[in-house]
Structures are given as C-alpha cells and as structure tokens.
C-alpha cells in the first residue's frame, strides 16, 4: 500500500485497484481498512479530509523513509538470490 500511495493520494477503492494491478493481490475491505489503520497508527500514512464521501490517504515522510528501506532490502535480497542461483547453475 505504501508503494501505491507513493504515486499519489488515493481513496480506498483507487488504492485497492492500484494494488491489484501492480501486485496481483485483491484486498478485501476488512484487510484494506485494517492495514490502513495500522499504517495510520504507525504514522506511515495520513487520512485526508473526505471528498464526496471518499476519504483519501497520503503517505507521510516517515512512510516514504520506511518504504525506501523496505525497497532497498528487497533489492538486496533479490540480487543475492540471483547471484546464488547463478552459482548453483555452474
């Protein structure tokens, strides 16, 4: 969800569709709102003023920092995995 919100503010439906498109994961309403509640509690996202009964969310600076750390770690692990697979092919 942080990856989705890094691309701009989104309300729940737009967030669900975006995550489904780039990650292939369908988030149910319970899962979505529980995750948003945790992210908001941890100050990684903030809820903005409602627009036409839709409540958009925005990633915070702290959320961007956490996302950058997670992406760097994922990149490091992917690189290590590819290196080890190449060694195993020899």
Feature map (PLM): residue ranges:
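N-terminal helix-turn-helix DNA-binding core of bacterial DNA-binding proteins
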Residues: 1-31, 51
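Histidine kinase transmitter module recognition
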Residues: 4-7, 48, 66, 70-73
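Conserved anionic group-binding/transfer micro-motifs
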Residues: 15, 63, 74
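Basic amphipathic alpha-helical segments that dock to polyanions
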Residues: 32-34, 38-39
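Beta-hairpin "wing" of winged helix-turn-helix
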Residues: 40-52, 58
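Basic, amphipathic "hinge/linker" alpha-helix immediately C-terminal to the N-terminal HTH DNA-binding motif
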Residues: 52-71
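Amphipathic alpha-helical dimerization/coiled-coil segments
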Residues: 68-90
């Amino acid at each position: 969800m942080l990856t989705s919100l890094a691309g701009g503010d989104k309300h729940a439906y737009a967030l669900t569709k975006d995550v489904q498109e780039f990650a292939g994961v369908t988030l149910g309403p319970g899962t979505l709102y529980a995750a948003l509640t945790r992210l908001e509690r941890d100050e990684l996202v903030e809820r903005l003023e409602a627009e036409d009964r839709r409540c958009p969310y925005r990633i915070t600076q702290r959320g961007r920092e956490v996302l950058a750390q997670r992406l760097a770690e994922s990149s490091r692990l992917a690189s290590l995995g590819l290196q080890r697979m190449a060694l195993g092919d020899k």
